[in-house]
UniProtKB/Swiss-Prot annotation:
Pathway: Sulfur metabolism; glutathione biosynthesis; glutathione from L-cysteine and L-glutamate: step 1/2; Sulfur metabolism; glutathione biosynthesis; glutathione from L-cysteine and L-glutamate: step 2/2. Mn(2+) 2 binds at residues 723, 725. Monomer. HAMAP family: Glut_biosynth. In the N-terminal section; belongs to the glutamate--cysteine ligase type 1 family. Type 2 subfamily. Mg(2+) 2 binds at residues 723, 725. It comes from the Bacteria. It comes from Pasteurella multocida (strain Pm70). Mg(2+) 1 binds at residues 702, 723. This is Glutathione biosynthesis bifunctional protein GshAB. Its EC number is 6.3.2.2, 6.3.2.3. Keywords: ATP-binding, Glutathione biosynthesis, Ligase, Magnesium, Manganese, Metal-binding, Multifunctional enzyme, Nucleotide-binding. Residues 494-753 form the ATP-grasp domain.
Length: 757
């Protein structure tokens, strides 16, 4: 099968580079010193019966992290990053993810528990593996790389060739060519990427075959790794022979099931191999790869891209390896696996030749410049083995003292990195924090997640056959269409609440700046709030707590409000403290005191300097990707300073509280303090009633309350509603400035999927 001519003549180079990718990464859970734990798989990850992202491989201690299929490797790595961060932050404080493939700190065999799965057949299969291979070999971890050619490419190639009549036969032979050539040249990938040079002597039943201080390239890929008995030989000459030989070994009892065949290439896309004859091979799984301990996720994006183009070259080349050449490739793999990592391989000339031809392919298919650089970098490693992963690893182990010590150091380092921005998912940092928090929780619980529109924060969540759509973290089908429209319009909100019998402050609405300013006399010396009719997140709001003192400030506040909307409200200011109630369904789940943006004087620094110092806090940022927002020093803040007789250059006295905003929104630099347990129950019930009046399932209700300990009475002096908000912020409740965290995203999930275990 010769396809490079078809690709070149029909300008299919770009389509040739497309495909689908998925990674499966195995890792041991360990203690701080690198010893494998004997604890059960953490219950926080839900049930392994259905979890699409977090599974266990052989043992309870052996995590398997699985990315969903993606069209771009960059997206595959985003998912791998997110799943890692979820796992790292969910593990017990004293547990870590071991970054090396070969196990260290092995417990006694009787302490190693096979994965305790719901399906008895899955447990029985693992118990069978124990009898055949022993437990220690099963504790080896690695990376499985799943790759599917673009179905459009396969269709185009089939139409443009004249050798095959059957599309299934063509597809099978295309993938089989990739598999056979991969097995022939797999030693190249092992030489460059192997990372299992040693293992503790306890791993071996009959003593270590390694001399003291001896290092090799890959124990995992050697006869001492996770391999079948040499007697078991499955033919790759054709799909028919592959199926027949695999079924033969199962029928004779040499393999308990087809999945026990541990080839470095596995044909995928069917439950039974025989199905390939009618439905075709759908993708390949490459199982060769050791964990790269120098990469936080066990593999680098550059190496994943190299593997991709290497796999493409396996079908680009005109030659197709036969079974004899496949066996030669296996023998060469075993030989290279036992070479010293700092010595040149005996087959360097062949390796260099293959990569030079690979570079030629990249040129002909119009590959990105980055791919040329990646391959050229690999090419240099044939003359300098110290640059290979195994070469680097040997030196790192010698420096650390042992593989276990190195693994422990890196495990602690990688866990610390996962907590640097503990409130965010680094790969989806462009999404708002509430959506990131929801993503964290659904991935943790095992709900299948599809990001429909990243910029619009739109998710599709699936549990079994149950599908829910979520926008902005808590906007769902449980809300009526009209409810956000009511809450968006502050005038309508007040009228609806007033009709429902809730206390609302009196207000006057204006549609022109001139008329509003001309009404100054109505509000002189009155404490008022000036705000746009339709707003959220505190935009355009000015509060005169001490009363309107002059026309100029009044006009300025109106001007700011009119920038946000064509209609503005001037509302009576209610005396008391403002609290945000987060309501979901029939329950107030969280109550927050939002302290307006402020700084505290120290008799040394100016207001501007104090603001800059407070803004340095790691939780402060743009407010959408951080739990707290940096404090601004704009027109509204300077008006607030003026009310206090200050400017940005004033130096406040020690412990002097300087208010920079009167409104308490976190989105304008405020501080968040959880008050859920302190708030009297009567106000929580009021918030639920207000939410129902809005026709909402989820609502952020803002109440002014003079005394949160006293029960509510019908009077406006007891409490008043100033706003009801659709899509209320959750992050300020999840990560408050002070007080107890309320993980509201979990409540959203319970609302959407009440059947979830």
């Amino acid at each position: 099968m010769k396809i490079q001519h078809i690709i070149h003549e029909n300008q299919l180079g770009l389509l040739f580079q497309q495909g689908s990718f998925g990674l499966e990464k195995e890792s041991q859970r360990v203690t701080a010193d690198g010893a494998i734990v004997t604890t059960p798989h953490p219950a926080v990850f839900g049930n392994r019966r259905y979890h699409p992202y977090i599974q266990t491989d052989f043992a309870e201690s052996q995590l398997e992290l699985i990315t969903p299929p993606t069209k771009k490797l960059e997206d595959t790595f985003r998912w791998l990053s997110v799943i890692h961060e979820v796992v790292q932050r969910s593990l017990p404080e004293e547990e870590y993810i071991f970054p090396l493939s070969m196990p260290a700190g092995l417990p006694a065999e009787e302490q190693i528990r096979v994965a305790q799965l719901d399906n008895p057949e899955d447990v029985a299969y693992r118990e069978y593996l124990v009898k055949i291979y022993g437990k220690n070999k099963q504790m080896v971890s690695g990376i499985h790389y799943n790759f599917q050619l673009s179905p459009d490419l396969i269709t185009r190639l089939f139409r443009l060739q004249n050798e095959y009549q059957s599309a299934v036969d063509f597809q099978n032979d295309l993938y089989l060519k990739m598999a056979k050539n991969f097995l022939r040249y797999q030693w190249i990938l092992l030489y460059l990427l192997a990372a299992t040079p040693t293992v503790e002597s306890a791993y071996f039943k009959d003593g270590s075959p390694l001399a003291k201080g001896q290092f090799v390239r890959s124990l995992r890929s050697s006869q001492y790794g996770y391999v079948n008995d040499p007697e078991i030989n499955v033919s790759f000459d054709s799909v028919e022979k592959y199926v027949e030989s695999l079924e033969h070994w199962v029928s004779t009892g040499k393999l308990i099931a087809e999945k026990e065949f541990y080839s470095n290439v596995r044909l995928r896309g069917a439950k039974k191999a025989r199905e390939f004859l009618t439905t075709g091979i759908q993708y390949l799984e490459f199982r060769l790869f050791d964990l790269n301990p120098f990469e936080i996720y066990g593999i680098s994006l550059k190496d994943a891209k190299f593997i991709h183009v290497f796999a493409l070259f396996m079908i680009w080349m005109d030659h197709t390896a036969d079974q004899e050449e496949v066996e030669l490739g296996k023998a060469r793999l075993a030989e290279v696996a036992f070479e010293h990592p700092l010595e040149k391989t005996a087959y360097a000339v062949e390796g260099e030749l293959v990569l030079l031809e690979l570079l030629s392919m990249l040129e002909q298919i119009g590959a990105e410049p980055e791919l040329f650089e990646i391959v050229k970098e690999k090419l240099t490693q044939f003359t300098d083995p110290s640059k290979t992963v195994a070469g680097r690893l040997v030196r790192a182990i010698e420096q650390a003292g042992s593989d276990q010590q190195l693994g422990a150091q890196l495990a602690q380092q990688y866990k610390a990195q996962a907590f640097e921005r503990f409130y965010a998912l680094s790969a989806f940092d462009n999404m708002e924090l509430s959506t990131q928090a929801l993503l964290f929780d659904v991935i943790q619980k095992g709900i299948h997640t599809e990001i429909l529109d990243e910029n619009d924060q739109f998710l599709c969540l699936k549990y079994g056959d149950h599908i829910e759509y979520v926008k902005n973290g808590n906007m769902t089908s449980h809300d009526s269409y009209i409810s956000p429209l009511i809450m968006e319009n502050k005038v309508v909100t007040k009228k609806v609440l007033q009709k429902a019998g809730f206390n609302v402050p009196q207000s006057v609405e204006f549609t022109s700046l001139e008329k509003a300013v001309a009404s100054y006399a109505l509000f002189e010396n009155r404490a008022v709030v000036i705000k746009p009719k339709s707003t959220n997140y505190g935009l355009g709001i000015t509060i005169f707590q001490q009363g309107v003192q002059n026309r100029e400030d009044f006009a300025k506040a109106l001007e700011i409000a009119f920038r946000e909307d064509k209609e503005v409200m001037v509302e009576d200011y209610l005396v008391g403290t403002e609290y945000r109630f987060f309501v979901l369904g029939d329950e107030t789940l969280a109550v927050l005191l939002r302290v307006p943006a402020n700084v505290v004087g120290d008799s040394v620094h100016s207001v501007a300097e104090l603001v800059a110092m407070k803004n340095d806090h790691p939780l402060r940022g743009d407010g959408s990707r951080t739990p707290l927002k940096k404090i601004a020093l704009g027109e509204i803040e300077q008006l607030q300073l003026k009310e206090q007789g200050l400017t940005i250059d004033s130096i406040p006295a020690k412990d002097q509280l300087v208010q920079l905003r009167a409104n308490s929104n976190i989105s304008t630099g405020g501080d968040s303090i959880d008050m859920t347990d302190e708030m009297h129950e009567s106000y929580k019930q009021l918030a639920v009633g207000i939410t129902k009046a809005m026709g909402a399932a989820v609502c952020g209700v803002d109440l002014i309350i003079p005394d949160l300990k006293q029960p509510a009475t019908p009077n406006l002096t007891s409490w008043g509603v100033i706003e009801a908000n659709f899509n209320p912020m959750m992050m300020m409740h999840i990560f408050p400035y002070a007080g107890k965290s309320r993980r509201l995203t979990q409540n959203v999930i319970k609302m959407l999927f009440p059947e979830l275990e």
